[in-house]
Every structure is written in structure tokens, then in C-alpha cells.
Amino acid sequence: MRTLLIPAVLLALLMACGGGQSGGVPAGAPPSGPATQPNGSLHGRRPFPADNPWNTDISSAAVDPDSATLLAGIGLGTGLHPDFGTVWAGAPNGIPYVLVSAAQPKVPISFDYADESDPGPYPIPADAPVEGGAAGSGDRHVLVLDLDHWKLYETWNASTANGGASWHAGSGAVFDLGSDALRPAGWTSADAAGLPVFPGLVRYDEVVEQGSIQHALRFTVQHTRKAYVAPARHWASADPSPALPPMGMRVRLKAATAIGGYPAHVQVILRALKQYGMFVADNGSSWYLSGAPDARWDDGELAALVGIKGSDFEVVAMSGVVAGP
């Protein structure tokens, strides 16, 4: 569930939006391959530079002094839930994405929140997978990764009424995957936190093909604070309570948490949560871990994640929290 609340006062100095950068194709980027690849493999390539917050090892970072209070506000006894898998309610379960090449035509797109969106056109295929299915409700994310230009195009509440000749969405954001640039301060994205969605997904190609996730993940909580902390750029709450997590808060699985008894593929996810953690990225059910759908997932294996409870996490120390008025 996504709620858009625009801060009343934006920071005076805005950082450049990722959509305005052009870093070209980084060395080692995977070949574009077929014209479009729904939920395709990146063959080990990692979005964003090595020093990007998404790619930073926080296993030894300090614990936030308010960690216990913040985790209690989310739910200490609630289990981690895989918000992805094979099929749910007749549609692929998770947030899908599609890989495209430079040959993919760009099409016009309009937005409900155009003042906080990167303008089109976007290279969205006519048959791009939509979260929840073409006729589904919900967040309806459409994520497109241009492998040749190494750019990410993300939309929320996306739809097309003319077979893909043009699209309409709640908002849209473009990220240069060779840059560390953030959204302008106070801006949303296709995510309530103003973050990119794709880098935080649990993906089949990493878990099974690569056997390693080398970046942070994303999750949702039911109640967030009217505040955000970098790399997030936007809040989506009217509640200023310091007991609630701000958007962008990062948690990690405690180093002492025993994971040896979990299925091997689940252990890949849990190791990433120890080393890179996960960001509060949206409002929704608490401790719901985001991922991409794939018919090859073993839903029974993924269900084992529920054995990890909120009390098994700790909040990574935060600084520079931006609070709403």
C-alpha cells in the first residue's frame, strides 16, 4: 500500500536526480541480449557504484541508540515475510521488471505527480510486466532496465489504454546506474521513500544462479514516521512519533542469528541481510521483504523466512534524519 504525502518545505539545496546523469555503460556490464527479457538475469552485474549506499557493507556499522524502540514499533514477534514467489491470486507474485536494449523505442508517458517525476519518454515495451498483472490493482509498478545505457526507469500505478503506444502512471523516476546521484530532496519516486525499487529486490538470478546477493534489500512497515534519512528522499506519513521508523531506515540481521538450519537459497538471502541489511522503502505490511516473481522459485523454501523475527534485527545508526514540520 502506497500513500504519497508531499513535504511542505523542500530542502533549499537539491541533489541532482539520477535521471539527469549519463554515465554510459560500465565495464563488465552484461550484454543486452534479446530485445526484452522479463525478470532476466544481470549475470552478476550490480547496479550503482561500489561505494553507493545500496552496495555498502554495514555488518560492522554501529547500532542506532533507539534501535530497540524502533523495532518494537514495527513488531518484535512478527516474522519476515517473502512478498514474492511464483504465483499469488492468479498473478506473478512480486514486483516484476524487464531488461531492454538500446533498440527499445521510447514512448510518451504522463504522471499524476509530474512535478516530482522525471519526464518521458520511457523505453517501456508494450508487453512490459505490471505488478499484480495487467488487470490487477495494487501498486502496479513497472520497472525497465536499459542494459546498454545502464539506466533504470521506474513507474508506480502504471497503465496503458492503447496497447503500449503511451503510458500513464502516478509517478516516475529515472536512475543512472553508474552514478551515486539521489533524487532531489523531498521528491518521491516509484517508491514512497524516493528510492529506486529494483536494486532492493530479491531476484532469482542472484539467489540461485549467482548464489550471492551483494546489495541491500527493501521491505515495508505498516506505520512510518513523517521523516526520511538518506538515501531516502521522501516521507509518506503524517505521524511525527520518534518511535516510528523514518523512510530509509536500515536494519540488519544480527550477526549471532543462526541460519545454518535454513534452506540453502534462503541462507543466501539471510547472509545478505547480515552484510547489507534492508531499507524501509514503503508503507505496507510489516516485515514484508520485496522480491521479483519467478516461476522457478520454491515457495515452500521461501516460506521458511518467517522463522526470522523482528527481534532478530537491529537498526543501523542513523544521522541527518529529515523530519517534517
Stretches found by the model and what they are:
Residues 14-16:
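C-terminal motif of bacterial Sec signal peptides marking the signal peptidase cleavage site
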Residues 28-325:
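Short, surface-exposed polybasic-aromatic patches that bind anionic ligands, especially phosphate groups
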Residues 1-4:
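Positively charged n-region of N-terminal signal peptides that target proteins for export
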Residues 18-21:
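Bacterial signal peptide processing site
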